[in-house]
């Protein structure tokens, strides 16, 4: 909360805070469900002369806390993710991304971040003709333009776009309408102007993001199952393997993501394998001891043994932050 008060957003902080709140909510929700919907629970309520109304009020209050906290994050993101600031703080990253997107190569970008950083950059350097996030403009939500998640309709309307953005864990501008399961996005400025998070009726609408524990289970729901399916396809489908893999600012704490990356590395080591032409992992740790621990943690997460483990001298790791990836342009050329 201290960072939020200073107008700072760190996704790890956000995820850990929401995870703690979610854990309380899920435990309480499970208990209320037991009391209301199980024979044993109903008998217990009747025998003890108890009511679940107070517990349900606690559940509603927890939802309010989640939405209030998320609203603060949206406000910070909306105030900071602008082209001028991106160009000033991430010029190296933007230059590298622009070089990767030149020509007619197809590029899939997978992000675990909830913000709209990549959308902002891609709309500027690629434009709408070559870029898709699998949403199509359809109708409005309370007067604001609504963009439905619909990969099939996107393909029918626009054909195959060569630059594709996948929000593996959703984004703060994405919502699920509970009445029919419709997933849609709103513009960040509309969310802020309408104070949507603070005014949201959680019986009708809820943020479409993955946080907290059990991500491997949560990823089985739409739209996350679609995004993860495409990610895994690039890692394991012999007819659609990625040739280059750049991993920027990832903690290697999501088992389902690690498993897919591990499979791609195994394919590269096989007898008739297809190794990656380029494999880069970018992090920001400056202390050598922390760097060594990170390398060890990556090898553990990817289940790499003595013969296959990634080493510093392989040139895979860059520890000077995401903006320094621009150096790769010179190396490749």
Predicted stretch roles:
Residues 1-4, 123-132, 182-183, 261-263, ...:
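Short secondary-structure boundary/capping segments
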Residues 2-4, 30, 89:
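Catalytic domains of lipid- and phosphate-ester/thioester hydrolases
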Residues 9-67, 99-209, 219, 223:
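Extended, H/D-rich, highly charged conserved domains that either
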Residues 67-88, 207-224:
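Glycine-rich phosphate-binding "P-loop"
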Residues 84-99, 223-234:
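A short, well-structured juxtamembrane/interface segment
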Residues 88-97, 122, 258-265:
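Short, well-ordered amphipathic alpha-helices
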Residues 93-97, 117, 151, 230, ...:
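Short, hydrophobic/aromatic alpha-helical segments in well-folded domains
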Residues 214-220, 225-333:
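SIR2/sirtuin-family catalytic core signature
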């Amino acid at each position: 909360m201290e960072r939020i008060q200073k107008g700072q957003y760190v996704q790890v902080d956000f995820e850990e805070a929401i995870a703690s709140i979610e854990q309380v909510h899920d435990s309480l929700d499970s208990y209320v469900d037991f009391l209301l919907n199980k024979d044993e629970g109903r008998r217990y309520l009747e025998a003890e002369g108890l009511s679940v109304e107070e517990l349900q009020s606690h559940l509603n209050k927890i939802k309010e806390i989640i939405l209030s906290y998320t609203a603060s994050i949206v406000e910070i993101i909306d105030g900071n993710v602008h082209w001028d600031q991106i160009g000033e703080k991430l010029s190296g990253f933007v230059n590298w991304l622009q070089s990767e997107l030149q020509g007619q190569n197809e590029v899939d970008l997978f992000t675990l971040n909830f913000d709209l950083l990549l959308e902002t950059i891609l709309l500027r350097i690629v434009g709408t003709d070559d870029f898709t996030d699998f949403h199509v403009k359809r109708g409005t939500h309370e007067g604001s333009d609504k963009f439905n998640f619909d990969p099939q309709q996107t393909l029918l309307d626009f054909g195959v776009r060569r630059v594709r953005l996948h929000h593996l864990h959703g984004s703060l501008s994405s919502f699920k309408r509970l009445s029919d399961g419709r997933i849609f996005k709103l513009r960040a400025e509309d969310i802020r102007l309408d104070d949507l998070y603070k005014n949201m009726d959680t019986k009708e609408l809820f943020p479409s993001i993955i946080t907290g524990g059990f991500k491997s289970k949560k990823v089985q729901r739409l739209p996350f199952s679609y995004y993860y399916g495409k990610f895994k396809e690039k890692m394991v489908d012999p007819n659609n393997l990625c040739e280059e893999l750049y991993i920027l600012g990832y903690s290697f704490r999501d088992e389902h993501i690690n498993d897919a990356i591990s499979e791609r590395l195994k394919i590269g080591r096989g007898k008739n394998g297809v190794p990656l032409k380029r494999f880069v992992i970018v992090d920001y740790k400056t202390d050598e001891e922390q760097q060594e621990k990170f390398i060890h943690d990556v090898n553990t997460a990817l289940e790499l043994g003595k013969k296959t483990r990634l080493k510093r001298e392989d040139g895979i790791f860059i520890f000077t932050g995401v903006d320094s990836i621009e150096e790769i342009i010179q190396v490749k050329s």
